[in-house]
């Protein structure tokens, strides 16, 4: 019944597209008039649009004309005219939705339409891509259109200094990777002045390969971290012990990706730990004094039994590097958290890095929800439409192709074993290679791609391998995968974002030419060669895409299929499966095995049947549903931290903006003074119960007050009067500091101390939340909801953090001291600038710019500063140097800067 109604009235997607096509006629009707404009007149349209917006017009009022202007600019500058379906894609993006467009339909060009329109507001547009190569490529190619129309373009890639980043973010349109955007957001909220920040307020983002970023990477938080205690020796010892365990000592669930010791395993490991003197002979692993070891044992078990080298990670240059399970790329700078990375390093016998403590973190889910307007584009999103709507409130609209898809998707073939499957794949590759048909073979891991590569090497079939080990060459290799007789093995969707053109990609070949020798002649030669090869490839049947396994997600399979049949080109796709494949073995083996027994599977024979395809699809849907629930659950927990993060970041910004820091100082002074007095002199208590001795000690510890016991000696004195006296004494201490150091210095110092103290307690709070999060699931055994428990305890920890902030801040302010022995009063206001400079330099350390900062960002909260005339310094006596700026030449006479000489270890 439902299918009949769909045929009669069309789907909701069909109706949306039909409505959008009616709007395209308005853009097309403007084209003749726009084409008559001179280059200068076309460029002036940008000024005209901005003026209209200033006078109250909305973006929707100018959308059709703006799109017509961009289309004409693209035609003149790049020789590319937007098709009607591309205009539809642009309207979808402008309206804050996701557009699904097939591979090769020109998504990069589509983004220019909403990017230009929304940049006219002057608030900036972020075009987000998955890697530095695509960000650089798109900003260079599409930037010509924006520049022609008078807009500025910026590009953000890893390793850029802040000055260049700031300029790029201030451009009208900025191309950047999702990683750099997220980390810059975290770094900005660790800086000490608004001028040091690089990002502008959030406005509008267009995410390319939106499914990869918002779905595949949603469970991977961005983390800036610093080292904690060195436990590398313990990881090494536990690793050796775990290697001695038997298969019966633990149970693992590959579906849930969990592993636990059995009763015999616990007994076995306790005896091994006891022999190594790691635990006492009369104690058990789960005794209170040994509980911390459980964490190390569990991570070692996971490292050895749940993670495989060249599948989940690879070892390069003595380092364990994570492989992205969806793209096959190495995730540079990323480390597993909670000690898992250290366990893998112990397993692979490489240097064990220190565990890291989180200093700042955010998930992509919460980062991208900061944008008031968000949109995205991809070739595959409809299968994830419910999740994108539920979590990000983004609707998905599938746009029809410009040319009809002529690609033929063949039925899957299933074999009893991996060897039989590889034999069948090899036979097909040989057949295609002999007639010159290009082949792209998709694998799910580096290990599988290298297995297949070795098979092809034995058969002497020339081929290229594209996986995480050859990341730098991936765009070039994938671009040439459509050439005559080309055989390319690719890990999943490595090279995504680069089109495979039949006959080859001329632009990339031209880029490699030597421009000094016969450049024009060589260009003509390349173009002629590619045109000839394209004819040969089309005659051979176009690109043949072979899948060596089904992925857990149907979307990833669809992406692989979408590599073939670009813009109406011919092509074929086929998946080869075996009962040994992970998806079949873990999720579908029983159901499929029953079907195969019914159909009668024999050695060396393949079965292809619609029933198998349906069973596989159900298995994939089951996994997708499980992964969706995991992402949703992660978001529920991360939302708790996100609410707290927003409060802290907003407060931090307010502190930086504030011109008067005394308000918080005075209110906190009064609050703490009252709290301390009431602690030692409770309301309604007798005088003889007052603890004056400890009151004096506490007031000195917090406020540096020397409390006079005589104040309490009066018979009629009350707690309220003593509180007022204490507050006045604290104010007097502060005033004396202002007189000694100047009010400007004290204002800046108070702000500086408040920020550094806030950073310190927030860092400690994140550490506490990490530990709380790790163990909270165990509350379910006590019939308690882990999420509710986490919310309650996280709130209590947050309140505790705020109390710690107040006390640490007040204590530091009132104990703050500058040695004036060698400092002129008129120079003292410069001392704060030196403190700020030192703070800035500590954050300019190269390690800080990495995803996992290698240096702790803890700040010295006892800034004692003195300056000495350089003439009075004895080069041989460092004690006579006083305070030396880190960028000054070292007083020892070495000729080096102080920070690289005697100051290197400060």
From Swiss-Prot:
Q: Which residues form a coiled coil?
A: none
Annotated GO biological processes are: intracellular protein transmembrane transport; protein import; protein targeting; protein transport by the Sec complex
Catalytic activity line of the entry = ATP + H2O + cellular proteinSide 1 = ADP + phosphate + cellular proteinSide 2
Domain of life (superkingdom): Bacteria
Database matches in Gene3D superfamilies: Helical scaffold and wing domains of SecA, P-loop containing nucleotide triphosphate hydrolases, SecA, preprotein cross-linking domain
Known cofactor(s): Zn(2+)
Q: Give positions of region: Disordered.
A: 862-885
Q: How does it assemble?
A: Monomer and homodimer. Part of the essential Sec protein translocation apparatus which comprises SecA, SecYEG and auxiliary proteins SecDF-YajC and YidC.
What is the protein name for this chain?
Answer: Protein translocase subunit SecA
What organism does this protein naturally occur in?
A: Rickettsia massiliae (strain Mtu5)
């Amino acid at each position: 019944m439902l299918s009949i109604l769909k045929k009669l009235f069309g789907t909701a997607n069909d109706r949306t597209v039909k409505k959008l096509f009616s709007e395209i006629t308005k853009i097309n009707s403007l084209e003749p008039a726009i084409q008559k404009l001179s280059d200068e007149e076309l460029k002036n349209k940008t000024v005209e649009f901005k003026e209209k917006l200033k006078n109250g017009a909305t973006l929707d009022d100018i959308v059709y004309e703006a799109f017509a202007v961009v289309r004409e600019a693209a035609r003149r500058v790049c020789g590319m005219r937007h098709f009607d379906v591309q205009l539809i894609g642009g309207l979808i993006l402008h309206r804050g939705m996701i557009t699904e467009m097939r591979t090769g339909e020109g998504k990069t060009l589509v983004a220019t339409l909403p990017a230009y329109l929304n940049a006219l507001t002057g608030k900036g547009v972020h075009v987000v891509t998955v890697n530095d190569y695509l960000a650089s490529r798109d900003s260079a190619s599409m930037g010509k259109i924006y520049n022609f129309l008078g807009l500025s373009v910026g590009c953000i890639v890893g390793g850029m200094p802040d000055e260049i980043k700031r300029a790029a973010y201030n451009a009208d349109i900025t191309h950047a990777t999702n990683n750099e955007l997220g980390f810059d957001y975290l770094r900005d909220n660790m800086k000490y002045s608004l001028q040091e920040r690089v990002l502008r307020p959030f406005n509008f983002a267009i995410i390319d390969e939106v499914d990869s970023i918002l779905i595949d990477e949603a469970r991977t938080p961005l983390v800036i971290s610093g080292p904690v205690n060195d436990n590398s020796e313990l990881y090494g010892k536990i690793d050796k012990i775990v290697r001695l365990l038997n298969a019966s000592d633990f149970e693992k669930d590959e579906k849930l990706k969990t592993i636990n010791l059995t009763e015999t395993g616990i007994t076995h490991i306790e005896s091994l730990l006891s022999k190594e003197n790691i635990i006492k002979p009369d104690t058990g692993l789960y005794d209170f004094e040994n509980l911390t070891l459980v964490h190390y044992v569990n991570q070692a078990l996971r490292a050895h039994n749940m993670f495989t080298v060249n599948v989940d990670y690879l070892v390069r240059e003595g380092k364990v590097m994570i492989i992205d399970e969806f793209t096959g790329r190495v995730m540079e700078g990323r480390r597993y958290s909670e000690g898992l990375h250290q366990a893998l390093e112990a397993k692979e016998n490489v240097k064990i890095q220190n565990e890291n403590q989180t200093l700042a973190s955010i998930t992509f889910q919460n980062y991208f929800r900061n944008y008031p307007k968000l949109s995205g584009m991809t070739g595959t999103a409809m299968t994830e439409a419910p999740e994108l709507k539920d979590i990000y409130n983004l609707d998905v609209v599938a746009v029809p192709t410009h040319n009809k898809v002529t690609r033929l998707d063949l039925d899957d073939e299933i074999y009893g074993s991996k060897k039989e499957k590889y034999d069948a794949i090899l036979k097909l590759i040989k057949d295609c290679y002999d007639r010159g048909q290009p082949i792209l073979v998709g694998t799910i891991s580096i290990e599988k791609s290298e297995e297949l590569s070795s098979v092809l090497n034995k058969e002497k079939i020339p081929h290229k391998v594209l996986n995480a080990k050859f990341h730098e060459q991936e765009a070039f290799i994938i671009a040439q995968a459509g050439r005559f007789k080309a055989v390319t093995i690719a890990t999943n969707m490595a090279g995504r974002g680069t089109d495979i053109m039949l006959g080859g990609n001329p632009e990339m070949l031209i880029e490699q030419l030597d421009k000094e020798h016969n450049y024009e002649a060589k260009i003509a030669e390349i173009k002629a060669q590619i045109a000839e090869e394209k004819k040969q490839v089309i005659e051979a049947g176009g690109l043949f895409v072979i899948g060596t396994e089904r992925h857990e997600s149907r979307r990833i399979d669809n992406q692989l299929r979408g590599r073939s049949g670009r813009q109406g080109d011919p092509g074929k796709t086929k998946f080869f499966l075996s009962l040994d494949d992970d998806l079949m073995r873990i999720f579908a083996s029983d159901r499929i095995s029953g079907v195969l027994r019914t159909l009668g599977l024999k050695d060396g024979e393949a079965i292809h049947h619609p029933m198998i395809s349906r069973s596989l699809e159900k298995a994939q849907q089951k996994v997708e549903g499980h992964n969706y629930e995991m992402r949703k659950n992660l978001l529920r927990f991360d939302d708790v931290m996100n609410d707290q993060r927003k409060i802290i970041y907003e407060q931090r910004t307010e502190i930086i903006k504030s011109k008067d820091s005394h308000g918080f100082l005075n209110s906190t002074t009064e609050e703490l003074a009252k709290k301390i007095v009431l602690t030692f002199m409770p309301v309604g208590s007798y005088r003889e119960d007052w603890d004056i001795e400890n009151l004096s000690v506490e007031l000195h510890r917090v406020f540096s007050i020397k409390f006079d016991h005589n104040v309490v000696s009066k018979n009629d004195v009350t707690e309220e009067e003593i509180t007022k006296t204490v507050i006045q004494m604290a104010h007097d201490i502060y005033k004396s500091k202002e007189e000694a150091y100047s009010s400007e210095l004290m204002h800046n110092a108070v702000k500086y101390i408040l920020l550094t103290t806030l950073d310190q307690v927030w860092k400690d709070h994140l550490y506490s939340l990490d530990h709380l999060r790790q163990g909270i699931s165990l509350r379910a055994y006590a019939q308690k909801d882990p999420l509710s428990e986490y919310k309650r305890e996280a709130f209590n920890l947050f309140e505790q953090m705020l109390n710690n902030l107040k006390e640490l801040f007040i204590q530091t302010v009132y104990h703050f001291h500058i040695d004036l022995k060698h400092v002129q009063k008129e120079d003292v206001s410069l001392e704060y600038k030196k403190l700020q400079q030192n703070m800035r330099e500590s954050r300019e350390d190269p390690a800080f710019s990495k995803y996992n900062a290698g240096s702790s960002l803890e700040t010295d909260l006892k800034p004692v500063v003195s300056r000495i005339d350089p003439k009075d310094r004895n080069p041989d006596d460092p004690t006579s140097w006083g305070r030396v700026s880190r960028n000054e030449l070292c007083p020892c006479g070495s000729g080096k800067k102080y920070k690289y000489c005697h100051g290197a270890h400060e």
